Each structure stands twice: as structure tokens, then as C-alpha cells.
Amino acid sequence: MGSRHFEGIYDHVGHFGRFQRVLYFICAFQNISCGIHYLASVFMGVTPHHVCRPPGNVSQVVFHNHSNWSLEDTGALLSSGQKDYVTVQLQNGEIWELSRCSRNKRENTSSLGYEYTGSKKEFPCVDGYIYDQNTWKSTAVTQWNLVCDRKWLAMLIQPLFMFGVLLGSVTFGYFSDRLGRRVVLWATSSSMFLFGIAAAFAVDYYTFMAARFFLAMVASGYLVVGFVYVMEFIGMKSRTWASVHLHSFFAVGTLLVALTGYLVRTWWLYQMILSTVTVPFILCCWVLPETPFWLLSEGRYEEAQKIVDIMAKWNRASSCKLSELLSLDLQGPVSNSPTEVQKHNLSYLFYNWSITKRTLTVWLIWFTGSLGFYSFSLNSVNLGGNEYLNLFLLGVVEIPAYTFVCIAMDKVGRRTVLAYSLFCSALACGVVMVIPQKHYILGVVTAMVGKFAIGAAFGLIYLYTAELYPTIVRSLAVGSGSMVCRLASILAPFSVDLSSIWIFIPQLFVGTMALLSGVLTLKLPETLGKRLATTWEEAAKLESENESKSSKLLLTTNNSGLEKTEAITPRDSGLGE
């Protein structure tokens, strides 16, 4: 049974009626929780200013010859370099110089001045650290002293999470095809709550990382399966808008991270509160039906018919008999077309030199989109000003970006919108690098422009990739692009960590990649107004048609766009934030 025949059901019961809208917003609400967990480490993994803890009780503190400080307050005064230190006198008369990762004991106990040229002996920070608590009372870093020689453990918090995202998207996508969408939705959402709470109550670093890893797997699994679930209930006339705007709910999660981080400054309480966002979905997800698409593929025709009847009743429409509409063979499960069951490996994406260039360009765009998306978000704490407001604003601009994509891609074309979005992102990165840090407001505004542009590109690449390849490898093309995207999301935190070497390294990486991707995008064929390719010959013809640039205006743009969305079956689609 082809997707075109299945669309006949929606012609009877409605493409996006009341039934589909209720399901859509229930499932989209859980995307908010996924967005929360993807970016929770922006604040949970913050490394506050700190100094080594002295080996005894302090009687006096000196910093740059000013002595009216408490030791807890001086941490915020240290520069990012290692040369600054705090001089303290202990109650036993010893004088120590405390820096970020070491401490020195002065041999001459009569000199408490900041400048000291006498002999001193260096000791490691075996007594722990004193952290600045003006911004955060505690973070995962302060909980387990992930600084200095243990700093690399803190750097793994977000990359390991993204590695879990990579595995989860593959694992749960497989399970949903075997066990059904409904079961996996319930299992992943329940597990998100359990692993989220487990991370908050972790007794050590390794338990915390394990809980976060499994949290990432189930969150990613939900995003993939939830996307397929809602797309299998929505008809072709609404599928493009509905699929793109699922990203908007993910962006709302970013807003909640910023708001919760501002209100709650203790990491485990922050994590617990964020984890409760998934509770409303857990309470109602058990009433969600299985999709008729999956039921039919399993030969469960009576159950599929019941769901279609319920859809028609909710939508106040007339139902239809699946056996007549789809000409079902009631003796066995619905079979796919030969091209759908035919297996293809990655080498098919390098069918010839033309397709090879197309594949490498598409992969680069996926990589750039993900790298830019997470670099802008994770780097919000380095923009200056209020870091919570920065992240909030960077999340807000995503929502109009997806609306812009939905409108612009059918007006001026996929390739044009994608290329100029990448160029705009590259330009924003370049402008941020030349803005003096004292003008941080201008820097934040420019970063918002960059996030808007990269969000638009990121939202468009899913559909554009599917339109560039023939049916026999379409799912493989989107899936491989999604995998490249997730590899970039693993590397993005390391790029942000390099800002300690030079604060603009993330912008340099993203800007360079976006500029290169934009140039190469202009070499791709335009797919607006063209039917989806079903063979390699038709896919290659896209390129020749692009070069010829026929002057004939395509009057059926909107209809053909709908046909493309129809032909991209939910099984071909994937969601990889």
C-alpha cells in the first residue's frame, strides 16, 4: 500500500481536524520536555569562579592589598587567568596564597601583603575548593569538584548526553516499528521522568552521567517516534506546517530552561523541576491510540478501522471502509511496494559523481545546522550581560524562524532560503567577533539574528533533503543526515569549551562552516514546484533542470508542494534536534 492510497483516508475524515489537533498538541507538549533536557546543562554544568580551600580556619583575607573581603566573595574577583591569587592568614598564623588550582604556603609568616618575593612552598588542593555562590548556590561542577585536573569530566557532561541522543534515535526508531508507536511513546516519556529525577538524586558523578545518558536516549527516542506518530495522523495538506512547527515546541523548552535557571540556583532542585514538565503527558499518553498506518502494516485491520471511525466522529466527518478504499488483502499484513522493501546501503548515496557532491553538501549543511544551533545556545553564557535573558531571547527567535521557513520556502524556493539563511548566520558570527565586549547588548542582538538564521536553515534541511533524493534512498538520505547532525551536536560543547582559549572560537567555527555551506548550497538543484523523484534518472534531472533555468512560471507550486509532503511518508522522516 503506497502512501498516496493511504492519503485517501484523510480525504474522508479530514487532514487536520479536531482529533488530529488534540493528538498533535498532546504530543508536541512533550517536545517541550525534550527541549528542556537537551539544554539543561547550560546552567547545570556552569563552572563558578573558585579558589583552593585553605587547610584551616581563616582569620584575614587580602586581595590586591584590600583586606575587607570574605573568602567566598573573592572568587568572583579572580580573572580567567591563573596569575591572580588570594592571600589568607589562618588562625594558627600561617599565610597561604590561594589560586584556582594550587595553593602556596609562605615561609615568612610576618608578611601578609599581596606582593611577596620570599620563599614559599606549593601544595595541591587536597581540601577542595571554595566557589563563588553569588550566581549559583551549587552546580554539578561544584557538587563533585569538576575543576582543574578534573575539568575534563565537566566537559563530558553535554557531549555524553548527545551521544545518548545518537543511540536513542536509532534504538527507539527500531522498537517503534516492531512494537508500535504508542508503546514507545509511553515508555520513553515515563523513562524521561524517571531518569530526570534519578539525575537529580545522583550520589556521585558517574551515577549522574549514567542517568543523563539514558535520559538522552529516551528523550531522543521520543522526538523521533513522536514525530512519526503525529505525521501518521495528519494529512498531506497540513503535514509540512505541522512537522516544521514541532521545532517550535522544542524551542519553548529552551525558554523554560532560562526561566527555571533564573529562579532556581541549586542544580538538583533545578533538575527536579525541569523533569516534572513531562508529568502531564504521562498522565494522558495512555489514552493515545495506535496509528492506523502502523496497525495496517501489521495486518490489524479491525483495530485500524476503529481508529479511523473515531477520527471521523471527532472531526464530524464521514468515515470510510479501509477494505474498500485501500483494496486490502485481508489474509495478511499490508505489504510495501518493491522499492520500499528493497534494502540499500550507504554507498547508494554516492551513486555517481553528481550525487556524491550532492550528498557531501547535504551532510555539511546538516553538520553546520546542528553545530550552529547548539553553539549559539550553549554559548549564551559567554555573551555578556544577563545569561538567563540571553538564552531566553535565543530561544524566542526560533519560533518566528520556523514560521518564516514555512512561508518563504514555498515563495522563493528551498535552495534560496537555505543558502541565504546560512549566509546570514555566517555574517552574524563575523559581526559578533568585531563587536567590543562592552557593547554586549549589540552582541546579544546579533547572536539572536544568527540563531534565527541557523534555526531557519535547520528547520528546512529535513524537507529539502527528502526532496533531493529518489524514493529508494530517501529514508537513507534523511537518516544519514540526521546522524551527521548528531555528530555535530556531540562536538558543539567542545567548541564552546574552547572559548576559554579565545572567546570567539565558537563563532569562528560556525561562521566558517555556514559560509562554506551557503556557497555549496547554491550548487544544489531547486526542488520547489517539482515532483518527488522516484528514480536516479529523475533525481539527476533535477540538476539539469536547475542549470537550464526554464523561464516558464510554475503555476502549481502549492499543489506540488503538498504532493511532496504526501509522498514523504512518515517512515521516511526523522527528527533530530
Swiss-Prot record:
Cited SUPFAM superfamilies: MFS general substrate transporter
Alphabetized, the UniProt keywords read: Cell membrane, Developmental protein, Differentiation, Glycoprotein, Ion transport, Membrane, Spermatogenesis, Transmembrane, Transmembrane helix, Transport
Region entry Disordered: which residue ranges?
543-577
- GO cellular component labels: cytosol; membrane; plasma membrane
Keyword Transmembrane helix assigned: yes
Q: Kindly list every residue the record annotates as glycosylated.
A: N57, N65, N68, N108, N345, N352, N546, N558
Q: Which reaction does it catalyse?
A: (R)-carnitine(in) = (R)-carnitine(out); spermidine(in) = spermidine(out)
Which compartments is it annotated to reside in?
A: Cell membrane
One GO term in the molecular function aspect is: spermidine transmembrane transporter activity
Q: Which Gene3D superfamilies is this protein grouped with?
A: MFS general substrate transporter like domains
Chief subcellular location? membrane
Q: Note the superkingdom of the native organism.
A: Eukaryota
Record field: transmembrane: 23-43, 152-172, 183-203, 214-234, 244-264, 268-288, 359-379, 389-409, 416-436, 441-461, 476-496, 501-521
Q: Does the keyword Ion transport apply?
A: yes
What is a single Pfam family found in this protein's UniProt entry?
A: Sugar_tr
How this protein's activity responds to pH is stated as:
Optimum pH is 8.5 for carnitine uptake and transport efficiency decreased at more acidic pHs.
Low complexity composition bias: residue spans: 551-560
**Mind listing the GO biological process terms from this record?**
acid secretion; carnitine transmembrane transport; carnitine transport; cell differentiation; flagellated sperm motility; monoatomic ion transport; organic cation transport; single fertilization
- Provide the membrane topology annotation: Multi-pass membrane protein
Q: Which tissues express it?
A: Expressed in testis and epididymis (at protein level). Expressed in endometrium (at protein level); highly expressed during the normal secretory phase, but expression is significantly reduced in the proliferative phase. Expressed at lower levels in adult tissues including bone marrow (at protein level). Expressed in hematopoietic cells, including CD34(+) leukocytes. Expressed in fetal liver (at protein level), brain, lung, kidney, heart, skeletal muscle, spleen and thymus. Expressed in leukemia cells. Abundantly expressed in ovarian cancer clear-cell adenocarcinoma.
Further information: Involved in the uptake of clinically used drugs such as anticancer agents doxorubicin and bleomycin.
Function per UniProt: Facilitative organic cation transporter that mediates the transport of carnitine as well as the polyamine spermidine. Mediates the partially Na(+)-dependent bidirectional transport of carnitine. May mediate L-carnitine secretion from testis epididymal epithelium into the lumen which is involved in the maturation of spermatozoa.
The family assignment reads:
Belongs to the major facilitator (TC 2.A.1) superfamily. Organic cation transporter (TC 2.A.1.19) family.
Q: What is this protein called?
A: Solute carrier family 22 member 16
